[in-house]
From Swiss-Prot:
Record-level GO BP terms: cellular response to lipopolysaccharide; inflammatory response; macroautophagy; negative regulation of protein K63-linked ubiquitination; nervous system development; positive regulation of dendrite extension; positive regulation of neuron migration; positive regulation of prostaglandin biosynthetic process
One of the record's GO cellular component terms: nucleus
This protein's name: Phospholipase A-2-activating protein
General function of this protein: Plays a role in protein ubiquitination, sorting and degradation through its association with VCP. Involved in ubiquitin-mediated membrane proteins trafficking to late endosomes in an ESCRT-dependent manner, and hence plays a role in synaptic vesicle recycling. May play a role in macroautophagy, regulating for instance the clearance of damaged lysosomes. Plays a role in cerebellar Purkinje cell development.
Residues where N6-acetyllysine is found: K529
GO molecular function list: phospholipase A2 activator activity
Residues annotated as domain PUL: 533-793
Amino acid sequence: MASGASRYRLSCSLPGHELDVRGLVCCLYPPGAFVSVSRDRTTRLWAPDSPNRGFTEMHCMSGHSNFVSCVCIIPSSDIYPHGLIATGGNDHNICIFSLDSPMPLYILKGHKDTVCSLSSGKFGTLLSGSWDTTAKVWLNDKCMMTLQGHTAAVWAVKILPEQGLMLTGSADKTIKLWKAGRCERTFLGHEDCVRGLAILSETEFLSCANDASIRRWQITGECLEVYFGHTNYIYSISVFPNSKDFVTTAEDRSLRIWKHGECAQTIRLPAQSIWCCCVLENGDIVVGASDGIIRVFTESEERTASAEEIKAFERELSQATIDSKTGDLGDINAEQLPGREHLSEPGTREGQTRLIRDGERVEAYQWSVSDGRWIKIGDVVGSSGANQQTSGKVLYEGKEFDYVFSIDVNEGGPSYKLPYNVSDDPWLVAYNFLQKNDLNPMFLDQVAKFIIDNTKGQTLGLGNTSFSDPFTGGGRYVPGTSGPSNTVQTADPFTGAGRYMPGSAGMDTTMTGVDPFTGNSAYRSAASKTVNIYFPKKEALTFDQANPTQILGKLKELNGTAPEEKKLTEDDLVLLEKILSLICNNSSEKPTAQQLQILWKAINWPEDIVFPALDILRLSIKHPNVNENFCNEKGDQFSSHLINLLNPKGKPANQLLALRTFCNCFVSQAGQKLMMSQRESLMSHAIELKSGSNKNIHIALATLTLNYSVCFHKDHNIEGKAQCLSVISTILEVVQDLEATFRLLVALGTLISDDSNAIQLAKSLGVDSQIKKYVSVSEPAKVSECCRLVLHLL
């Protein structure tokens, strides 16, 4: 730190907490305020007294039954324009406060050990880390997903809301990057527990650890820099408003201020553990320590404490004791230390430490460049950076690529770089290029074709395609044998020779066919215009196909093996045959109460023989009278019985038919009402079936989610949409069947149509990155077409 440069000095000290201050965060309101949490079980809101002098405790909030370890601010909403305060504690709970509430508005329960880190995102999303080795994602008062993968406490968490990314740092020495509930990347480098994370930009972040180092990372995985300066555990890290410089606090009794990648100033404090820090909008630094005192440091002369207050602080510092085992003092041989005369020699750098012997005592001093003197920091009792560079054939943004093309979108305008490796999917690269540079997604095929042609990849022909019902596959898509020429030979796809020209007749790709949902009306799609025939879906999708003869034959066969008290009589079987006949033949006749009673008896058979009865139920539940009887009159009893059949250890046939029955319930008002009331329980049980390999179950799961999406498109319930989006994201991780994938895409499109909040929530879950791979699916064409339409909304 050069002489004359601005220097942080004490602004004020804020007593109030009775024990260690463990967490600090800047507040949205009032301006310039901050919140602190402590081992004394309280949360306190501090507001500035005036533009230049001190803070006053405005509110003291209680709610935890043990010490409070972390805090964050949830952004403002229509209901809470000043935002909310979230605190995590040793009682395993997260308390949510409004700014004027002494007690929690609500408490989030789910962690099994201390909640030690919190970070907020958009629309009420909250990420928590715990000693139980997990992180949890919350929306309002609901846990949406649990992130599992660390093998020790999750000490630090951060959300990057714009990219839908989440970061977790752990005592297992690793940092993990999560997207839509899955671990995308693990960052290795720290040699001890990771204690803190801070976001620099959309592509970079900082971490600090018990190994006394700070690391700067790219989200792609590269460690760009390692900073050394602290000599003990680093507990917290906070970034300045310029998003470049930062501050850290540690077990070495110091606050360190880092500018331009170097430690510009070291401030010692009269406490052993400097637990936490935050940087206010005006650049002032707030620090919490093990002595229960909050201290504010400033560069501003106007906000600097009085000379008397600074002298009192230095006196307190000089009276502190330093453990030689935890300080940065090295091996000490008191007999070889110089005397006080050594203090007449100036230091060589800001924060330099010097030990002198004064009789039997060993005193520690720190050099202040701006003051030009040695300041005593206590009585003793008891780093260089590293750059990582890569080299290769073509280097772009720190990574090696086989090709880096320059793309001119507008003649005479700026060019864009398009990096590509031969092992990459050209459609994914093209999609990422268009998204990154905010270019029209309708150019996807042209950019992908450009990549293929210029890297000697295989040319994929496009031709006339006829569309079909995307759910049944009737009249399925068959690639055309001829079509318009889309040849682009070694040319920039936007402005190069032989380039694609939007609206050019020679480049149009014509597609004709029927509406894939209704079978009516042909449509025409060109590169400049895409007709969305897929979503939002307005009506529930049902499972209708059946072979009544086979169903009844199996029912009669298994009836012989049923327990005596469960067996059906010949008359009972006749009644079931009649109800099945009138359902399958669309008869206007209504099922009788006796028929419904026998059907209820049959679906309560033992699990190993019940499936043909469930198949009759699946078909019958679409009838208004059956739907009313089972979904309204029997209601909870009916849904509980079917939910029990979804047990992952149960029989796949029962699981499948129960799911299909739930899907068919949506056709009537009574069924919709029951499905909405049972949504949380049903979806949480249904999602447990995702990990199996049965494609029919995956299709049924996707259809159930789609039918819920139809309901939520009419009723904008953000919590319900959030659960559906989470389920979609979870199933997408394991699904292989393209029909199930297509239905999930339609569900996703239905959920986010005309709803900016749902779009942002989907982005925060990283769903857009999950579905990108489907833009290159050639058959069935409905998958890639629907995917592109969804991505256009995202």
